[in-house]
From Swiss-Prot:
InterPro entries: Na-dicarboxylate_symporter, Na:dicarbo_symporter_sf, Ser_Thr_transp_SstT. Its main location: membrane. The lineage of its organism: Bacteria, Pseudomonadati, Pseudomonadota, Gammaproteobacteria, Moraxellales. Involved in the import of serine and threonine into the cell, with the concomitant import of sodium (symport system). This is Serine/threonine transporter SstT. The keyword Ligase does not apply. It is a multi-pass membrane protein. It comes from Acinetobacter baumannii (strain AYE).
Length: 400
C-alpha cells in the first residue's frame, strides 16, 4: 500500500489528502485535534526554510545572471516586466472587487495595521532594507533579506567562476531541501484540512472556491486581455491568432508539467516553427522561464490581499502600487522551486507588518488549492515566454 502511494504524483497525493482531511473532519471531528500536529510541523518547516531560501535563491540568480548579446533581448525583457506589473495590478483590482476571506489562526494578531501614509511606508521599507543580515534571516524580515541578497548578488557578479559555482551549488542544495519539505505536503495538508473543516465547517469550501475563482479568473484575464494588448501594440496587428497558438501548444503542456523549465524545449520548438530568430529564442525563452512569472505575481498579490482583508488591515492606493512592484520582484525569484510563488508570499506580507507565522498559514492555504493554481500559473508563465519572444521577433522583421 505504501509502495503504491509513493508512486503517485504530488498532485494526486494532495487531492487524496484533501479528501481524507474533509472526510475525517465531517465523520470524526473529535479526532482532529490530534491531527493538528501534522499541519503545525509542516508550517514550522516552511517557516524555517523560507528565509534562507529567498536569500540564497535571489543571491545566486543575480550573481550568475548573464545578459546575452541579442539585439532583440531588451524589448523582450521590457515586455516581461510590463506584463508582470500589469498582471499584479489586475490582481489588485480583482482582489478589491471580490475580497476573499481565509480561515487563519490569528490569535493575538488582531491589532495589525498598515502604515498610514506613503511616507510611513517608505520609512518602514528603508528601515527594513538596512536591517542586519543575520537578524533579517533569523527574524524572517523578508524585505531585509531581499535587499542583502540583491546587494551581495550584484557584488558577486564580478567574482570568480568558482565562487559563482559555489553559490549555485548552495542554491541547488537549499532547493533540494525545499523539495523534501514539499514532499511531506500531503501529510501537512491532511492535518490542516481536517482541523480547518472541523472548526469552520463546509463554509471553508466556499472560501477556497472564491479564492480559486479570483486567482484563475485573473490569470485568464491576463492571458486573454492583458497579453493580447501588449502583443497587439508590439506587432501592430491582430494578436489573437498568435496568442491562441501559444496557449494551445505551450500552455496546455505547461499546465500538466507544472514546470516552466521543463517546458523550455516545447517553447523552443514552437519558436522555431514560428520562424523566430534562434539567437533571440535561445536566450529569451530560458531567461523567461527564470524571470517571467506573471502568474506568480498574480498568486502573490491575490493571496497577500486576501490575508490583508482577513486581518482587517486598511490599505491605500500607494500601498497597493508598492505591493504590485514587490510582487513583481518576488515573482522573478519564484522559478525552479516547487511552490515557489507560494513560498515568496511572506515577502509581500511583510510589507503590511504581517508576521511570518500568519504568512506561512497562507502558504499552507495556497498548497491546498495548488492543484489548479500552480498548473494554471505555469501555463500562463510559460506560454507568455514564447508569446512575447515571437511578438518581438515579428516586430523586428517588420522594421527590417
Amino acid at each position: 500500500m505504501l509502495e503504491f502511494f509513493s508512486r503517485l504524483s504530488l498532485v494526486t497525493k494532495i487531492i487524496i489528502a484533501i479528501i481524507l482531511g474533509i472526510g475525517v473532519a465531517l465523520l470524526f471531528p473529535t479526532v482532529t485535534p490530534y491531527l493538528s500536529l501534522f499541519g503545525e510541523l509542516f508550517i514550522k518547516a516552511l517557516k524555517s526554510v523560507a528565509p534562507i531560501l529567498v536569500f540564497v535563491l535571489v543571491l545566486s540568480s543575480i550573481a550568475n545572471f548573464q545578459v546575452g548579446h541579442s539585439a532583440n533581448l531588451r524589448p523582450v525583457l521590457l515586455l516581461y516586466v510590463v506584463g508582470m506589473l500589469l498582471a499584479a495590478f489586475s490582481a489588485v483590482i480583482a482582489s478589491l472587487s471580490f475580497p476573499s476571506t481565509l480561515y487563519l489562526n490569528t490569535v493575538s494578531h488582531n491589532n495589525l495595521q498598515a502604515p498610514g501614509s506613503l511616507a510611513d511606508i517608505l520609512k518602514n521599507l528603508l528601515l527594513s532594507f538596512i536591517a542586519n543580515p543575520v537578524q533579517a534571516i533569523s527574524e524572517a524580515n523578508f524585505i531585509g533579506i531581499l535587499a542583502w541578497a540583491i546587494g551581495l548578488g550584484l557584488a558577486m557578479r564580478h567574482s570568480s567562476d568558482t565562487t559563482k559555482q559555489v553559490m549555485q551549488d548552495v542554491s541547488h542544495a537549499v532547493s533540494a531541501i525545499i523539495h523534501k519539505v514539499i514532499a511531506f505536503a500531503p501529510v501537512g495538508i491532511f492535518g490542516l484540512v481536517a482541523v480547518t473543516f472541523a472548526d469552520a465547517g463546509l463554509a471553508t469550501l466556499e472560501s477556497y472556491a472564491q479564492l480559486l475563482v479570483v486567482l484563475l479568473g485573473t490569470m485568464l484575464f491576463v492571458a486573454l486581455v492583458i497579453n493580447p494588448i501588449l502583443v497587439g501594440l508590439t506587432i501592430r496587428g491582430n494578436p489573437y491568432p498568435l496568442v491562441f497558438k501559444c496557449l494551445k501548444e505551450s500552455g496546455i503542456t505547461a499546465f500538466f508539467t507544472r514546470s516552466s523549465a521543463a517546458n523550455i524545449p516545447v517553447n523552443l520548438d514552437l519558436a522555431e516553427r514560428l520562424g523566430v530568430n534562434p539567437s533571440t529564442a535561445s536566450v529569451s525563452i530560458p531567461l523567461g522561464a527564470t524571470v517571467n512569472m506573471a502568474g506568480a505575481a498574480v498568486t502573490i498579490t491575490v493571496l497577500t490581499l486576501a490575508t490583508v482583508h482577513t486581518l482587517g488591515i486598511h490599505v491605500d492606493l500607494a500601498t497597493m502600487i508598492i505591493l504590485s512592484v514587490v510582487a513583481t520582484i518576488s515573482a522573478c525569484g519564484a522559478s525552479g522551486v516547487a511552490g515557489g510563488s507560494l513560498l515568496l508570499i511572506p515577502v509581500a506580507c511583510s510589507l503590511f507588518g504581517i508576521s511570518s507565522e500568519i504568512a506561512m498559514q497562507v502558504v499552507a492555504v495556497g498548497m491546498i488549492i495548488s492543484v489548479l493554481q500552480d498548473s494554471t500559473e505555469t501555463a500562463l508563465n510559460s506560454s507568455t515566454d514564447v508569446l512575447f519572444t515571437a511578438a518581438v521577433d515579428i516586430r523586428s522583421r517588420q522594421n527590417s
